[in-house]
Amino acid sequence: MSAVEDWYRQNLGDVDIRTIDSGDEVFNLARCRNLGIDSIADAGEVVVINDADTIPQLEPLLGAIAAAATSGLVHLPYTRYHWLGTPGTAQFTAGTPLDRCDYELVKGACSGVYVTTPQSWWSHGGQDERFRGWGFEDAAWYVAHETLLDEAPRRHEGVVYALHHAAQAREGDQYDANAALMEQYREARSNRDAMRQLVGSDVTAEKARRLPAS
């Protein structure tokens, strides 16, 4: 995470950076994000949830931070997601500016960097911790946000840069379980009652306690 932490130190100064790991045997990204938010005492404090391998641009991030304080929504400080992969990451490591590194454009990306308050995050249930290993927790979260808050996560014009990391298998029993759970989210799209029931059934995060009654 050093490249990401270095970027934040250089651009935002002495900010509170917390590294979160849930300790699950099978990596659980949704749980890591939820734990990070749950560690914030002030429900109105603006928080940046940043994957360990993703670097934002400064101006979109600052815009998202300012807006997230009052919008009641989660903000994504980008409209373009550049996956640098091995070649682009090697270029960056060698000193090439991020905006000049080779990349693959990932269409529809809704992960990497989130800007929110705890109140906004939990207002639509956070992320579903039943997603484990690779896949779908971000897409399911996006659908829940759209359905329960009547608006998609709000984007800010800009780019995020995802550095190379080892890919996880997109097959097997856990992947199939993730895909099946994602299908439930698709079926609940635009049905507020169905979505609330689906999100609230993620008891691992005690969602029923956090999700508002109406």
Residue ranges and their predicted role:
Residues 1-26:
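Acidic donor-binding segment of Leloir-type glycosyltransferases
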Residues 20, 75-80, 156, 163:
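Short glycine/serine/threonine-enriched helix-capping/active-site loop
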Residues 21-23, 30, 56-60, 64:
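Preference for well-ordered, secondary-structure-rich cores of eukaryotic proteins
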Residues 24-40:
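Glycine-rich, basic loop-to-helix element that forms the pyrophosphate-binding segment
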Residues 43-55:
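Short beta-strand-to-loop acidic/aromatic patch adjacent to the donor-nucleotide binding site
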Residues 53-56, 82, 132, 140:
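A short, conserved beta-strand element in the Rossmann-like catalytic core
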Residues 57-129:
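Conserved catalytic core of nucleotide-sugar-dependent glycosyltransferases
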Residues 130-214:
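C-terminal catalytic/acceptor-binding lobe
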